[in-house]
UniProtKB/Swiss-Prot annotation:
Subcellular compartments: Cytoplasm, Cytoskeleton, Microtubule organizing center, Centrosome
Name assigned to this protein: Spindle assembly abnormal protein 4
Recorded name of the encoding gene: sas-4
Keywords for the protein's UniProt record, in alphabetical order: Cell cycle, Coiled coil, Cytoplasm, Cytoskeleton, Developmental protein
Compositionally biased spans, kind Acidic residues: 1-11
Native organism: Caenorhabditis briggsae
Comp. bias intervals (Basic and acidic residues): 90-106, 265-280
Function per UniProt: Required for centrosome duplication. Plays a central role in determining centrosome size.
Length: 761
């Protein structure tokens, strides 16, 4: 029958014992017997993966350290020690030791720390060699192993088996030589393997071997250890549980039960039994009702085996680190030796080369000395003869050198002449290239101009065709719906022309401020994307007024300036600008790419569009249009629409004009200077003619003066009963620069007072 885990039946009969592991020590701090020899100076190494918070290793030697398992000097592992097999021969009297013996044993115990003091950076594994030196501790362990082997032989004769569930299942694999609790053990198996460590069943002190033999033979050992296993599965379970005690760390701790009575000398140890411990103390099966002393010893043995296993793993890890460091040092040594050998070989090669050159020099000097010695041995006549021959050779050598120098000078002059020709040809080609580039640019401009003129001619032909079709429709009595149309081109077509002309802008700009509502030619159908919304980030005072800089999320900027004449000036980052008054009646837009200027009178549906150095277009309601050309033969073309019929007046630079329609023949007339012509709307709109290139368009909303193809001046008259100012727009036809001015209604000294709103160039 298995004993109770809480040990309730022994609370009143056993005295409390001091906990073997003190509070806070854990598996990293353990006790070991004092030795007379001094402790080793090598640092202890802590292996974090063996702590309870980490995953448990599969064996005490999880590192391939290279130390064979048959090494006698190695301490036994957990699997080879008696972990879960309690003694079947311990009697009740073994727990009645005196308190003085317990104190003597505790005094012979010291606390050893296995915390980490040095962990190398490189954790590479290496093969470790076996240790050839047998220490004193290894000798003691070997003697202990012999003693345990003798005890195991006695136990095997009893044919008993342990089914103690003192440890829980674990995934730790045992070493090569491990105890096998499956079935009964034979004496010859133990004698063949000297490293086999069966359970340490030590007979109690108050029983002799004869007494134990009599107990075993009399059959009084009626305990679970004396009965065989029920089946193979239980046998395998016991074998797995007996391999290691690391499963003690994976199970929750049972609350210790304090005995009812305590010994007076151990009252100070009672709080220590309340302290939590990371070990689960097993209660193995006993032959009869065991004393608490036996269970304490079993627990101490179990904890010592766990500490021994961790210490072996730490030693293996330290040995592996040492050997990895040795391997690194050997590699560094080999590398350094190789470098030194290469350096030595290079230096030896340099020395050999120096020796060779020195030997050659000595040979030359030796030859010269030998020649001089022979000359000195000869007579005066022979010396003079040799000197004469030497002089002749030197002269011949000199003449050859001079001829070679002359040839080289000649070649040099030829090369210089050739290089000079190349330089001249290169300069000529460079000039031709520059001239051709200029010609190409001029031709490109000419082609562009021709293309523009062709587009204008096509547009005029289309206009004339439209007039002809309308005239035919009127002659045939078919009603037309042109009276309901506003003007040509419409606002949408003008907006499209503005968008195509502004290649640099290419998008609509809005502002986050509460600016006055504006009706631009770009209709509001386009949906603004969030990155195109501009927000103010800088405000300062400029020469035209207070200006605010706006910026969107993609880096585009726009400067908005509040000007006089109750207007706003928008300057875009691509060079375009737009001015409009707060009444949304006048709008001026300039495109920086082609220097085009657009003036819109939004309340009257009138537009002025000036294309730089090409023409000026005036669009009125009812499809009445005026085209003023800068370089064409016809300086002005008037398109009239009356009662759905169209006719055209074309004025040339000689002072003559011709009227064209599809009902009457063409009429050529001369215009007297100072007269009026081109009447519209019952005479309210007309043109005052001064010269072929000097005329003024007089209309109720504005006055437009064209002066000799150099200056265009447009005076925009303010609306009655509105808080507006009369504006004057002047544009230089040749340069594209201009100015916007505010005109006062009152005259001073017969002259109108003008104030500059803003200029542009």
């Amino acid at each position: 029958m298995l004993p109770s885990e809480n040990g309730d039946e022994d609370q009143g009969s056993q005295k409390p014992k001091r906990a073997y592991l003190r509070k806070g020590e854990g598996t990293a701090r353990f006790r070991m017997t004092r030795r007379s020899a001094p402790l080793t100076s090598s640092p202890a190494i802590n292996l974090p993966r063996f702590t309870p918070t980490n995953s448990a290793p599969s064996s005490a030697r999880t590192i391939d350290s290279g130390i064979p398992h048959d090494d006698d000097t190695r301490p036994p592992t957990t699997a080879s020690l008696p972990l879960d097999q309690p003694s079947v021969l311990e009697s009740h009297d073994s727990g009645n030791r005196s308190e003085s013996n317990e104190r003597r044993e505790e005094d012979n115990v010291e606390v050893v720390s296995a915390m980490q003091s040095y962990v190398p950076g490189d954790r590479s594994s290496s093969v470790l060699e076996t240790c050839s030196k047998v220490s004193e501790e290894a000798t003691q362990l070997r003697a202990e192993a012999d003693r345990i082997t003798a005890q195991a032989n006695f136990i095997n004769s009893m044919k008993s088996v342990s089914i103690t569930p003192s440890s829980y299942s674990s995934n730790i694999s045992g070493p090569i030589y491990q105890s096998t609790p499956k079935g009964s053990l034979r004496h010859d198996d133990l004698s063949d393997d000297p490293t086999f460590l069966p359970p340490p069943l030590v007979p109690p002190r108050n029983h002799s071997p004869q007494t134990l033999s009599s107990l075993a033979s009399s059959g009084s050992l009626d305990t679970p250890q004396a009965r065989p296993l029920a089946g193979n599965r239980l046998n395998m379970m016991v074998q797995n549980e007996a391999q290691t005690g690391i499963s003690l760390l994976n199970n929750p701790r049972r609350q210790p039960m304090l005995p009812a009575h305590h010994h007076p000398s151990q009252k100070e140890n009672v709080p220590e039994r309340k302290a939590p411990s990371e070990h689960v103390y097993d209660e193995p099966l006993q032959i009869q009702r065991p004393h608490r002393r036996n269970r304490e010893e079993q627990r101490q043995k179990h904890n010592l085996m766990l500490q021994l296993r961790d210490t072996i793993a730490h030693l293996d890890y330290a040995s592996e680190c040492v050997w990895s460091t040795r391997k690194k040092q050997e590699e560094a040594y080999a590398k350094r030796m190789k470098e030194l050998e290469e350096d030595f070989e290079s230096k030896m090669q340099m020395i050999q080369e120096d020796n060779t050159s020195e030997e050659e020099r000595l040979k030359r000097e030796r030859r010269d000395i030998e020649r001089d010695r022979k000359i000195l041995q000869k007579g005066i006549g022979e010396r003079e003869k040799e000197h004469t021959q030497m002089i002749a050779k030197l002269r011949e050598k000199l003449s050859n050198s001079e001829s070679q120098n002359a040839k080289l000078r000649q070649d040099k002059r030829a090369v210089e002449e050739k290089m000079k020709k190349f330089i001249e040809e290169n300069e000529k080609l460079t000039k031709d290239l520059n001239r051709n580039r200029a010609t190409c640019q001029r031709l490109e401009k000419h082609i562009k101009q021709l293309r523009t003129e062709k587009e204008k001619d096509d547009r005029e032909k289309e206009m004339f065709a439209k007039v002809a079709m309308n005239r035919k429709a009127a002659a045939s009595g078919i009603a037309t719906g042109s009276a309901a149309s506003s003007r040509l081109p419409s606002v949408s077509s003008l907006a499209s022309s503005m968008k195509t002309g502004s290649t640099g802008k290419g998008r609509t700009v809005s502002f986050a401020d509460d600016e006055p509502e504006e009706q631009t030619l770009e209709a509001g159908e386009e949906t603004m994307q969030p990155e195109f919304i501009m927000r103010p980030y800088e405000t300062k005072q400029s020469r035209f007024g207070t200006s605010t800089m706006y910026r969107d999320s993609i880096g585009e900027t726009t400067r908005v300036t509040s000007t006089i004449a109750n207007g706003l000036l928008f300057e875009y980052s691509n060079g375009d600008f737009r001015w409009m008054n707060r009444q949304n009646s006048v709008e001026i837009y300039r495109i920086a790419v082609d220097k085009s200027i657009i003036v819109n009178l939004l309340q009257y549906n009138i537009s002025f569009i000036y294309f730089f150095q090409r023409q000026l277009e005036v669009w009125r309601p009812g499809n009445n249009t005026t085209l003023i050309s800068v370089k064409r033969r016809e300086v002005r073309t008037e398109l009239h629409c009356e009662n759905g019929t169209y006719y055209t007046e074309m004025f040339d630079r000689n002072g003559r004009y011709v009227t064209k329609d599809f009902c009457r023949p063409e009429v050529f007339k001369d215009i007297p200077p100072g007269s009026a012509c081109s009447y519209r709307d019952g005479g309210t709109r007309y043109v005052e003619y001064t010269a072929p290139e000097d005329f003024e368009l007089v209309e109720p909303e504005y006055r437009l003066r064209w002066y000799q193809g150099k200056v265009m001046v447009c005076k925009i008259i303010k609306r009655p009963r509105c808080n507006e100012k009369t504006l004057r727009v002047q544009v230089d036809v040749t340069t594209g620069s201009g100015i916007l001015e505010e005109v006062e209604s009152q005259l001073k000294d017969g002259q109108s007072q003008k104030t500059t709103v803003f200029p542009w160039s």
